[in-house]
Amino acid sequence: MLRGQEERKYSIRKYSIGVVSVLAATMFVVTSHEAQASEKIPTTNAAAQKETLNQPGEQGNAITSHQMQSGKQLDDMHKENGKSGTVTEGKDMLQSSKHQSTQNSKIIRTQNDNQVKQDSERQGSKQSHQNNATNKTERQNDQIQNTHHAERNGSQSTTSQSNDVDKSQPSIPAQKVIPNHDKAAPTSTTPPSNDKTAPKSTKEQDATTDKHPNQQDTHQPAHQIIDAKQDDNVHQSNQKPQVGDLSKHIDGQNSPEKPTDKNTDNKQLIKDALQAPKTRSTTNAAADAKKVRPLKANQVQPLNKYPVVFVHGFLGLVGDNAPALYPNYWGGNKYKVIEELRKQGYNVHQASVSAFGSNYDRAVELYYYIKGGRVDYGAAHAAKYGHERYGKTYKGIMPNWEPGKKVHLVGHSMGGQTIRLMEEFLRNGNKEEIAYHKAHGGEISPLFTGGHNNMVASITTLATPHNGSQAADKFGNTEAVRKIMFALNRFMGNKYSNIDLGLTQWGFKQLPNESYIDYIKRVSKSKIWTSDDNAAYDLTLNGSAKLNNMTSMNPNITYTTYTGVSSHTGPLGYENPDLGTFFLMDTTSRIIGHDAREEWRKNDGVVPVISSLHPSNQPFVNVTNDEPATRRGIWQVKPIIQGWDHVDFIGVDFLDFKRKGAELANFYTGIINDLLRVEATESKGTQLKAS
């Protein structure tokens, strides 16, 4: 019996040793993996890292398997002999277990010391692999830099920082190294740069487009940036354009004697518009549109200091002067610009001027729309062209309009030309009217006397034909089309019509006691049928060139232009309208697209791109959508908007489902924000002068 008890005690001791050994092995495996995790260092050599990580894992798995088998054998022995155990045997077992645990603890400490030593050796090996991989990556990057002639700043410091990571702290796994020809690849501890205000040259953009033709930047603003470089070199032609020869003027803008940048050349700008990917996103536009500041409940003072006056273009009818079925000019049904901006707390107005009148007549009407009073076209002008001197009477939105009290002017299409001419009259007057007044006496409108500076803060043009349009030369100003336009005016001038198309100064309004037959006979004798004092002529290349010669830049005004393009190059090299272009502009788009001069072909359906960028004889600079457009005395040319035709700027194409109201809201919000920056810049300048 004593022998049996001794055997059972021996079995129990063996079982205790096994249990403790299993626990020790488990602790060893956990400790080994923790040490391994803490010693991982970022490396660009994925193969070496994988090989290093697999070694301790395999050792741990082998140890665990061996200890599990030993534990299982001891467990089987315990099941056979453990049924007859006594309390005394249990006490002996506990004492033996304590003694054995002490011995096992010493063994574990010895094993851990050995493991730490092995891990240190592996760490040195991994560090060597990392240095070799890093050096190899640097040599590859140097080759890429030599190939693409691009500067990479900070790559050495980044590599050094990666090698000097504190080994006492767990490191973040290294990212896969991708060669970047524009800038150094960011490390895992530094987030990639998201700076969109840094300009790129056209050459860099073309290279990016070639490498990733289908890649789109979803973080870009609503308008596609064609020319994203801010050019500090002002472009000014020394020669004024010859009438009917604008192409020579544009080709000669950048003379070899002047410092120029191909990024600001009109031909290059249009070429970039062809190659640049379309990244306009209506989703992004909808998100940006939500940034519009709502009108506060107790707000009385508008958000903008100076009123914003929107001026429509050719064929435009607004407010009470628009027929029942005529679309809302500013925004259509997609986004009612005037109404929505007023809800946001902005002081905005839509001017109502002649839909068919000349820029001269429209400029005079615009002045009286703002100031108020009866329209005075001028005695000299009326005598020269043969229409009435006085027109309708405006109530005025700003009767106290005078120097120091300014307005912002935003013009679509022909409206941009009208704005420029009115500002010229305010500042420099009308020489013909001044001379006529001196010779004949009588009254003269304050508009024509000049000396009224500092009454306009900014001029913004949207798809304006500053240099004219071939569509007017070859279609709009033809005799047949003019007869149709004037016949429409004659019909709408009957006594029962409340619609004013803007030619009442020419007699296109039936008198109360006049029969319709007599009215037709009278109007048929009007000089308008053969006159150039109308919109059809002013939109031609010659008419626009004359306007450019009449106007100048005001150093106190911020000038900005927006341009769209909705055509593509066909197999024969001519421009064809894009799918989705407003159907009424298909013919005019093809007329422009088949011009003999290649740089004049790209268009928005009505206006060639080269004409909308800026007046050909005035200085300009290309700006991005990200930078504040607050410069004065120079045309700031915004990037060409891909896929926008002439009426997309005002949202009246009800058949175009690609252009959403949120996109239009974002566009006009951007304009308003620029105008607020102009006011802030002006206020800051005033404070600096006062101090």
UniProtKB/Swiss-Prot annotation:
Q: Which residues form the signal peptide?
A: 1-37
Q: Which ranges are cleaved off as propeptide?
A: 38-296
Instruction: List the active site.
Output: 413 (nucleophile), 604 (charge relay system), 646 (charge relay system)
What does the record give as the reaction this protein catalyses?
a triacylglycerol + H2O = a diacylglycerol + a fatty acid + H(+)
Q: Where in the cell is it found?
A: Secreted
Give the GO cellular component terms, alphabetically: extracellular region
> A Pfam family name for this chain?
YSIRK_signal
UniProt lists compositionally biased (Basic and acidic residues) regions at 73-82, 197-214, 258-267
Annotated spans, Disordered:
34-267
Q: Which residues bind Ca(2+)?
A: 580, 645, 648, 653, 656
EC code: 3.1.1.3
Q: Which residues form a coiled coil?
A: none
Gene Ontology biological-process annotations: lipid catabolic process
Q: Give residue spans, biased composition: Polar residues.
A: 41-72, 94-115, 125-135, 142-172, 186-196
Q: Which domain of life is it from?
A: Bacteria
Any idea which GO molecular function terms this record carries?
Answer: metal ion binding; triacylglycerol lipase activity
Name of the protein this chain belongs to: Lipase 2
State the organism named in the record: Staphylococcus aureus (strain MRSA252)
| Gene name for this UniProt entry | lip2
